[in-house]
Swiss-Prot record:
Residues 612-710, 759-786, 946-996, 1139-1178 form a coiled coil. PROSITE patterns: EGF_1, EGF_2, EGF_LAM_1, EGF_LAM_2, LAMININ_IVA. This is Laminin subunit gamma-2. It comes from Mus musculus. PANTHER family: LAMININ SUBUNIT GAMMA-2, NETRIN/LAMININ-RELATED. One of its GO terms (biological process) is cell adhesion. Residues 213-381 form the Laminin IV type A domain. Keywords: Basement membrane, Cell adhesion, Coiled coil, Disulfide bond, Extracellular matrix, Glycoprotein, Heparin-binding, Laminin EGF-like domain, Proteoglycan, Repeat, Secreted, Signal. A motif (Cell attachment site) lies at residues 586-588. Disulfide bonds join 28-37, 30-53, 56-65, 68-81, 84-96, 86-102, 104-113, 116-128, 139-150, 141-155, 157-166, 169-184, 462-470, 464-481, 484-493, 496-514, 517-531, 519-538, 541-550, 553-570, 573-585, 575-591, 593-602. Epithelial cells of many tissues, particularly high levels in tongue, hair follicles and kidney. Basement membranes of the collecting tubules of kidney and pancreas.
Length: 1191
């Protein structure tokens, strides 16, 4: 079978449409620059040599590789073509002359057009700019307001700048700034004023995070909002976050960067950032700003660039809507200002890919504040119109209220509508108490009721569910509910807000509370109408998703629509249109292949079996396989020693047969190779002809379309002619009736019969003329039909490819084109004839009218000859009408035939496409080996990446082992220190037991303490088994020192001092206990203070609740508020302040006690050090000491 596949592949390779160079120079004449060419029929027809060179070397191009490619040149014909290397900005094109000189733009010079001429500067896409010194000396422009150099002697201002010197802002703008691409900043003023100027009351203020002490309130989150670890580097004074997965992690800014940042508009946000490892490809979501329901984002770098690895770089972003700031989506001016007014989130991407780490430092947001200092001229001061006040016209003036409270400072201010012309609350519009008309008493309505505007003394319940308050719109007297729950809107809170669905009142079915639409994050959060507000069906799915909840992929796409990363959601099916079912792929992206195709994308021909043309090859290969198996059997017998001398003879014979068969196969292959080359040439020729036929068929199709259009025009004109003839017939009938009823008196009106006869003859002549025109039109239609049929027949012959040579094909095509041109001319002639017939018919109609007028003037004429002549004219008109009807039918048949011919032409075109598809299948088989090699390369790359990851993990493990080793060594060092301390404790314990054996009761306490120390040391020895030997040595040392009691007199005093210190320790212990007791008491007092504070806060909440109640406030309510405030102040002064003073005093005393304890501990440590020095100075050995007392 392997040999069979090899034969198949060999056959496919021999069919490739390229001709290898042969010894005949007339085949591939490529000037030594290529060894491949292909036959081109059109080139052969034009030049007589039909071979076109392929894959020209040495940067050459042309039919015979005779010239250099675009952007290359050479000094002589046989030289290599060298690159021009023309500068992309300074040259007019990529080409150059034979010397390598590029064509330069104005003001540019150099062989490569890469530098400016003297007197010019700044090379740009438009060339070099002339120096200012070369310009008009009167050109005096403000550099902050011009958009470019003053080349023409006049200043070219930025869009928001005006003035002869570009030194003034246009009306509605302020603050001329050189860094502003618009020149000046538009007045904001919340949209209430277009007049403003720079404020002198604000100074520059920078909101920064330098991370010198800690993370400064920053956090780290994943894309889905889950928290991530954020680390602070004490060494580098920055923060960083790492990720093991590809999902990105973001730095989240603290509250000081959020909130109302209006004064930062037009200023910069900058930070230092670096990334280690990872993908390092910037994305559109690197920096994200959110606020007021809007979101904008920007990449760290331009698309196509890569973030530097391990290098800290400062990134700066301008906070405005100008396209140069690279924020997307691009907001309007007021949308951007609205976002900055309520900035709710600032996120900076930290990681890029797996095992990525991002570092951030020196975050700076340029802002301003109303204090003295360096001026901030970008802050505006508005000139407010009537009804507004404040620096930014953000407040309503006295006597005005907010028209729409939900818009906040963006809402318009309108006059108060209080009875008596009184003032009102600027935000709610409620009239102040005492400002109403004193003659009318208004009822004080509770929550859930409102004043009837027609009867202010009565209260009506609000038409709101759940007892929500309401108010009356002054203009329309409409009752509107206030404070609807989240997700609910409408005048009666009866509708779900945008982004929510349900039916709060059950007006269209069962009651369903409003809930957020579940579209699986597959809609644009900034868009409106993402889902149906009643059913919740998602209407604007993005990321190629579909379904009720955007939880499915659209037809022709696959992937996970619920993936958090948009790049991992639905992707287009990458299926071969030739080998796959249209518009279908499976959930894993694999395509549904047609029969005979395979592979993930159905782009590989399925190699289940060879085509039918290889059956003979398969039979021959089966025979060779059988012979090979018999040879193997003979060899096995020969190796086994069986069969005597007969086997070698048979083996040799079979080998000779095999060699002969191989020679035959080789000869056949060589013959087949020549045949295959001829087939390849013919295939290339057939492809070229196929392209020509396809082009000509397209021309025929266009011609048929034009003929159809002309036919429609002719049909319309024939219908017009028929209509005119009908009108003529009616006119003639009327004339005949008049003639029949006319009596002519010879004495009054005598008209000779010759006059009527001449009129009748003229009418007859006109009718004959129309008949001839109709016959001519019919003949033209028949000729058009014949020519179209001939063209269709010839097209069929051409596409079938049978029955003639290339020259015959060429002649046939030329004949077909001639017929086509003749058909076009006939169509034009037909159009002219139809137009002429139309004109003639109209003339006849007008003449008939004149005849009718003449006849109407004849009163009482009774001439039988006139009646006969009129009947003859009518018959002539009837025959003309019948002829026109037949002509119309003929045109209809031609039009129908044109439709059929178009259908047949389309079928022929589809046949050509099918043949082209067969050729593409052969090419796809030839590319199979290449695809397999690419797959092997991909597998090799994957293996390399896996090995690299393993190496990285091993290195990290090595570092961890080194860290653990260092910790173990440190623990071993501490172990020796602990052992030494245990030995010292045991030594001192033995000394205390020997020296204080007959001490007084005061020293007994020290002995007990030493015993306890011995017990502690014994427990430590049990825990550390390796210290038993040292404990024994310590015991031996204690026995040796027992014999030198005389030398311990001085040490006795030290031990007494130690006992005294222990007594002090006990005293300090009591002091500590006292401190603990006092701390507990302080905690109790703090708890009591907390209760008091909570009571005070409850009182304040109650006061604020009373203040927030709608409606007017009477004097009694004001007195209750004042009493509540007085009680709260009294409670704070009488209870909280003494408690705070007492707590501060106790904290001071505790600090003093701690200081005393630290001093005592230092003294004890010094005594221990002194004892250690005494012990070290004692001489070793045994001594015969005297008893302390003589008996």
């Amino acid at each position: 079978m392997p040999a069979l596949w090899l034969s198949c592949c060999l056959g496919v390779a021999l069919l490739l449409p390229a001709a290898q160079a042969t010894s005949r120079r007339e085949v591939c004449d490529c000037n030594g620059k290529s060894r491949q060419c292909v036959f081109d029929q059109e080139l052969h027809r034009q030049t007589g040599s039909g071979f076109r060179c392929l894959n020209c070397n040495d940067n050459t191009a042309g039919v015979h590789c005779e010239r250099c490619r675009e952007g290359f040149y050479r000094h002589r014909d046989r030289d290599r073509c060298l690159p021009c290397n023309c500068h992309s900005k300074g040259s007019l094109s990529a080409g150059c002359d034979n010397s390598g000189q590029c064509r330069c733009k104005p003001g540019v010079t150099g062989q490569r057009c890469d530098r400016c001429q003297p007197g010019f500067h700044m090379l740009t896409d438009a060339g070099c700019t002339r120096d200012q010194g070369q310009l008009d000396s009167k050109c005096d422009c403000d550099p902050a307001g011009i958009s470019g150099p003053c080349d023409s002697g006049r200043c070219v201002c930025k869009p928001a700048v005006t003035g002869e010197r570009c030194d003034r802002c246009r009306p509605g703008y302020y603050h001329l700034d050189r860094a502003n691409p618009e020149g000046c900043t538009q007045c904001f003023c919340y949209g209430h004023s277009a007049s403003c100027h720079a404020s002198a009351d604000f100074s520059v203020h920078k909101i920064t995070s330098t991370f010198s002490q800690d993370v400064d309130g920053w956090k780290a989150v994943q894309r889905n909002g889950a928290p991530a670890k954020l680390h602070w580097s004490q060494r580098h004074r920055d923060v960083f976050s790492s990720a093991r997965r590809s999902d990105p992690v973001y730095f989240v800014a603290p509250a000081k960067f959020l909130g109302n940042q209006q004064v930062s508009y037009g200023q910069s946000l900058s930070f230092d950032y670096r990334v280690d490892r990872g993908g390092r490809q910037p994305s559109a979501y690197d920096v994200i700003l959110e606020g007021a329901g809007l979101q904008i984002r920007a990449p760290l770098m331009a698309p196509g660039k890569t973030l530097p690895c391990g290098i800290t770089k400062t990134y700066t972003f301008r906070l405005n809507e100008h396209p140069s700031s690279h924020w997307s989506p691009q907001l309007s001016y007021f949308e951007y200002r609205r976002l900055l007014r309520n900035l709710t989130a600032l996120l900076i991407r930290a990681t890029y890919g797996e095992y990525s780490t991002g570092y951030i430092d020196n975050v700076t947001l340029v802002s301003a504040r109303p204090v003295s200092g360096a001026p901030a001229p970008w802050v505006e001061r508005c000139v407010c119109p009537a009804g507004y006040k404040g620096q930014f016209c953000q407040e309503c003036a006295s006597g005005y209220k907010r028209d729409s409270a939900r818009l906040g400072p963006f809402g318009a201010c309108v006059p108060c509508n209080c009875q008596g012309g009184g003032a009102c609350d600027p935000d709610t519009g409620d009239c102040y108490s005492g400002d109403e008309n004193p003659d009318i008493e208004c009822a004080d309505c509770p929550i859930g009721f409102y004043n009837d505007p027609h009867d202010p003394r009565s209260c009506k319940p609000c038409p709101c569910h759940n007892g929500f308050s309401c108010s009356v719109m002054p203009e329309t007297e409409e009752v509107v509910c206030n404070n609807c729950p989240p997700g609910v809107t409408g005048a009666r809170c009866e509708l779900c807000a945008d982004g929510f669905f349900g039916d709060p009142f059950g007006e269209r079915g069962p009651v369903r509370p409003c809930q957020r639409c579940q579209c699986n994050n597959n809609v644009d959060p900034n868009a409106s109408g993402n889902c149906d507000q009643l059913t919740g069906r998602c209407l604007k799915c993005i990321y190629n998703t579909a379904g009720v909840y955007c939880d499915q992929c659209k037809a022709g796409y696959f992937g996970d629509p619920l993936a958090p990363n948009p790049a991992d959601k639905c992707r287009a099916c990458n299926c071969s249109p030739m080998g796959s079912e249209p518009g279908e792929c499976r959930g894993d992206g694999s395509c549904v292949c047609k029969p005979g195709f395979g592979g993930l994308n159905c782009d590989h021909a399925a190699l289940t079996s060879c085509p039918a043309c290889y059956n003979q090859v398969k039979i021959q290969m089966d025979q060779f396989t059988q012979q090979l198996q018999s040879l193997e059997a003979l060899v096995s017998k020969a190796q086994g020693g069986g069969g005597g001398g007969t086997v070698p003879v048979q083996l040799e014979g079979r080998i000779e047969q095999a060699e002969q068969a191989l020679q035959d196969i080789l000869g056949e292959a060589q013959i087949s190779e020549g045949a295959m080359r001829a087939v390849a040439v013919r295939l290339a020729k057939a492809r070229s002809q196929e392209n020509d036929y396809k082009t000509r068929l397209d021309d025929l199709k266009m011609t048929a379309e034009r003929i159809r259009a002309l036919g429609s025009q002719h049909q319309n004109r024939v219908q017009d002619t028929s209509r005119l003839i009908s009108q003529m017939r009616l006119s003639l009938a009327g004339s005949e009736a008049l003639l029949e009823n006319t009596n002519i008196h010879s004495s009054e009106h005598y008209v000779g019969p010759n006059d009527f006869k001449s009129l009748a003859q003229e009418a007859t002549r006109k009718a004959d003329s129309h008949a001839e025109s109709a016959n001519a039109m019919k003949q033209l239609a028949r000729e058009t039909e014949d020519y179209s049929k001939q063209a269709l027949s010839l097209a069929r012959k051409l596409l079938s490819g049978g029955g003639g040579s290339g020259s015959w094909d060429s002649s046939v095509v030329q004949g077909l084109m001639g017929k086509l041109e003749k058909t076009k001319s006939l169509s034009q002639q037909l159009s002219l004839e139809g137009t002429q017939a139309d004109i003639e018919a109209d003339r006849s109609y007008q003449h008939s009218l004149r005849l009718l007028d003449s006849a109407s003037q004849l009163q009482g004429v009774s001439d039988l000859s006139f009646q006969v002549e009129a009947k003859r004219i009518r018959q002539k008109a009837d025959s003309l009408s019948n002829l026109v009807t037949r002509q119309t039918d003929a045109f209809t048949r031609v039009r129908n035939n044109l439709g059929n011919w178009e259908k047949e032409t389309r079928q022929l075109l589809q046949t050509g496409k099918d043949r082209r598809q067969t050729s593409d299948q052969l090419l796809s088989r030839a590319n199979l080996a290449k695809n397999r090699a690419q797959e092997a390369l991909s597998m090799g790359n994957a293996t390399f990446y896996e090995v690299e990851n393993i190496l990285k993990n091993l290195r990290e493990f090595d570092l961890q082992v080194e860290d653990r080793k260092a910790e173990a060594e440190e623990a071993m060092k501490r172990l020796s220190s602990i052992s030494q301390k245990v030995a010292d404790a045991s030594d001192k314990t033995q000394q205390a037991e020997t020296a204080l054996g007959s001490a007084t009761a005061d020293t007994q306490r020290a002995k007990n303490a030493a015993r306890e120390a011995l017990e502690i040391s014994s427990e430590i020895e049990l825990e550390i088994g390796s210290l038993n030997l040292e404990a024994n040595v310590t015991a031996d040392g204690a026995l040796a020192m027992e014999k030198g009691t005389a030398t311990l007199k001085s040490e006795m005093r030290e031990m007494i001092e130690l006992a005294r210190k222990e007594l002090e320790f006990d005293t300090d212990k009591d002091t500590v206990q006292l401190v603990i007791t006092e701390a507990q008491q302080a905690d109790a007092r703090a708890t009591s203070a907390g209760v008091t504070i909570q009571d005070t806060l409850n009182t304040l909440d109650g006061i604020l609740h009373l203040i927030d109640q709608p409606g007017s406030v009477d004097e009694e309510g004001m007195m209750l508020l004042e009493q509540g405030l007085f009680q709260a102040k009294t409670q704070i002064n009488s209870r909280l302040r003494p408690l705070m003073s007492d707590l501060e005093e106790r904290v001071r005393r505790q600090r003093n006690h701690l200081h005393l304890l630290e001093t005592s501990i230092d003294g004890i440590l010094a005594d221990v050090k002194n004892l250690e020095n005494i012990r070290d100075n004692l001489p070793p050995g045994c001594y015969n000491t005297q008893a302390l007392e003589q008996q």
